[in-house]
Amino acid sequence: MLQPKRTKFRKQFKGRIHGVAKGGTELNFGEFGLKALEPERVTARQIEAARRALTRHMKRAGRVWIRVFPDVPVTSKPTEVRMGKGKGAPEYWAAKVKPGRIMFEIDGVPVDLAREALTLAAAKLPIKTRFIQRIAE
């Protein structure tokens, strides 16, 4: 699963996801992509599950690019622990995804296969997404 090799600080504030993505909104690598339509924290496990669904459906043909990286540590306290006594330990990593962000790109497969594969990947994600295609110049 994806996670940073090292970080400056172990824990981060929760924060809020405001506005729309100002970068990563266009296809840069592949012919087809999956664009986020909602703001949400997407976990490393969800990204990995979507990646596996993509590659399995494409039968290892073509190429996949993951355009989001889980760089936010999410902490949680153990179950049945009273409030207070500090913040919990880092539990997993997540990526803050804004609307308009391209999450996955694929290339080297036909349109119908790409649409099916990205639809399967979208089912593994907690947000609404849209299939996008590069416009031929």
From Swiss-Prot:
GO terms for molecular function: rRNA binding; structural constituent of ribosome; tRNA binding. The keyword Ribosomal protein applies. One of its GO terms (cellular component) is cytosolic large ribosomal subunit. Keywords: Ribonucleoprotein, Ribosomal protein, RNA-binding, rRNA-binding, tRNA-binding. GO terms for biological process: translation. Part of the 50S ribosomal subunit. Binds 23S rRNA and is also seen to make contacts with the A and possibly P site tRNAs. Belongs to the universal ribosomal protein uL16 family. This is Large ribosomal subunit protein uL16. It comes from Azorhizobium caulinodans (strain ATCC 43989 / DSM 5975 / JCM 20966 / LMG 6465 / NBRC 14845 / NCIMB 13405 / ORS 571). The lineage of its organism: Bacteria, Pseudomonadati, Pseudomonadota, Alphaproteobacteria, Hyphomicrobiales.
